[in-house]
Amino acid sequence: MERTFVALKPDTVERKLVGRVIQRFEDRGFEIVEMRMLTLTMEMAEEYYGEHKGKEFYERLIKFMTSGRIVAMVIKGERAISTVRKMLGNTCPCDAEPGTIRGDFGLYTPANIIHASDSLESAEREIDLFFGR
């Protein structure tokens, strides 16, 4: 079984969509093995999104991700990383297919509901950052 990291962004919490998004993962047979709600500090957000430092959207992303509570999760299941990424849809909600999480709930970037690890290495790094392993 593979594990991946998923973060429900501040817009998901604010719009009371947490349960609906989690239900999608459970309906696909995934298991939520760890979960916590927190507000990112500036330092944690900068470490989390360090790969984007210097890009035009970086400051806006950091400001958004520290604007409210997020839900950090570890999800386990068969091919979790690739399947969860497909379930999310395109990063930009306007380009995401209906039936995907971003297509159904996303508003705009960065308020696109959710983040999920894109590789095994990213999943391990993000799980360690949020759950201390």
Swiss-Prot record:
Catalytic activity reported: a 2'-deoxyribonucleoside 5'-diphosphate + ATP = a 2'-deoxyribonucleoside 5'-triphosphate + ADP; a ribonucleoside 5'-diphosphate + ATP = a ribonucleoside 5'-triphosphate + ADP
Single GO term (MF): metal ion binding
Regions that span the bilayer: none
Compartments where located: Cytoplasm
Gene Ontology biological process terms from the UniProt entry: CTP biosynthetic process; GTP biosynthetic process; UTP biosynthetic process
Keyword Magnesium: yes
InterPro entries (UniProt xref): NDK-like_dom (IPR034907), NDK-like_dom_sf (IPR036850), Nucleoside_diP_kinase (IPR001564), Nucleoside_diP_kinase_AS (IPR023005)
Function in brief: Major role in the synthesis of nucleoside triphosphates other than ATP. The ATP gamma phosphate is transferred to the NDP beta phosphate via a ping-pong mechanism, using a phosphorylated active-site intermediate.
NCBIfam families reported for this sequence: PRK00668.1 (NF001908), PRK14540.1 (NF011112)
PANTHER family (UniProt xref): NUCLEOSIDE DIPHOSPHATE KINASE (PTHR11349)
Protein name: Nucleoside diphosphate kinase
